[in-house]
Amino acid sequence: MNRAKYVLLLALIAVVGAIIPQARTNGLFVIASFPSLVDDLELIACPGDRIDYLVPYGVDPHEYTLTPSDIEIIKKADLIVTTGHTSFEAKISEMAEKGEIKARVIEIPKIPGIVIRKNPVLGTPNYHMPIYDPENFITYMEYLAREMARLNPSCKTYYFERISSIRKQVERVVASTPKLSIDAVADSPVVQYAVEWIGIKLKYLVVAEHGLQANPDLAVVEKALIEGKIGLVVVTEQYRSKYSEWLIKKAIETGIPVLLIPSPMSKGTTIEKLRYVSLQVASIASSIQNYNVSAEHSRVNRRFYIIDYVAIALGILVYALMLTAIWCREK
């Protein structure tokens, strides 16, 4: 009888073990569509998690096509993170919808709470790395932590502890960054999320979108710089184009400060890039304030000059009328 109970107990344990999912012991396999996403993923990864990427460094992701080896890799992934705006990323999402891959696919623009800004020139949504904005970045990382904890419950505490540290670091950067209120021109839309949280409003873009030609009327941008309608030039640091160099040259000629922004496609965590932006803003904040004072002084002077010219013209007119009246009386 005891033997029968023992056999029954073993059978029950086997059945329960088959029903209840076992804790993951080998970590998650996470794939990033862009290599620039990897460093942020590694901030939160639990020991045992593996992080890899698809597009090689230096390759334009807008022109990239999935290779057979890419397909094999993503079929093994547990989680895939994409920016959700290139053709090869759309293919990955399509494969997930059709059930061709088992991975959970996260498209950054579709994460609840992510704010997508409008391209200041085209008025269309700007999908170029919205996580460069501090609030979007925290929203993104918290969402990742929850998804990774769901897929790998054994590391739930670790993921959430990492998120707490990340949030505090970002909040410190935001608190220490001088806030501005200034209109700017930038070389491309990839810098929009990196600067607008500071109060820098992009009014002009030399290149409005990837694949488009430069603004056909650069004279408009140059005129805005000369007339003081623009108080700051924003340039992508690592991947400068000839238009970036043109902007820097015009900024020097007009005495306007230049803010250099790490490309969102470059290596390094978003926190490191935000720290760099913060230091850059702090270093030029006084010159921006001086420029604003100077620009306002110039506008005031222009108003006074106009008033002076009008007064002189009226004086001449009155004098001419007096002479005319005297001449008429003498006749």
Task: List where the protein language model places each region.
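Extracytoplasmic metal-acquisition and chelation regions
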Residues: 17-331
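N-terminal Sec-pathway targeting helices
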Residues: 1-10, 308, 326-328
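Bacterial N-terminal signal peptides
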Residues: 9-17
